[in-house]
Amino acid sequence: DFLRLLSETVYGGELAGQGLPDVDRAVLRTQAKLVGDLPRLVTGEAREAVRLLLLRNDLHNLQALLRAKATGRPFEEVLLLPGTLREEVWRQAYEAQDPAGMAQVLAVPGHPLARALRAVLRETQDLARVEALLAKRFFEDVAKAAKGLDQPALRDYLALEVDAENLRTAFKLQGSG
């Protein structure tokens, strides 16, 4: 009954199966379509603020792909959050031979995670360290970009994210070293 009701909502167009993973994918794809329009609906500083917030989901997606590749999970099992890149780009990144190839795929649309991933890969190939350092660099870059905006709440939020990520990174690296 739940699936029938769900199929009659905005999610119905994306619902392709009867299992919980199918429902998750339908919700995420619908959300990606809705959220994906946000940067085109606003201009100026508001557009940059939206982009900076969506980049966080891109970081999550890249980390999820790195883990999936390392463990042999298929792309279809990776739940992508709505960010600044289309699912096709993430699929191409997943299909890359290695993390350096993923960075190359992300560099084509000029994504800032490409540069961050390349820099981290020069330091380490250990997946846990790659993830931790990638997040640390990413949040530092995003916080720097937010400083140029006249959005104090966003700047404060991203500064808090940087502090939290620095703590998380320190604990992860302490545990793995």
Language-model-detected regions and their locations in the chain:
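N-terminal domain-start signal
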Residues: 1-177
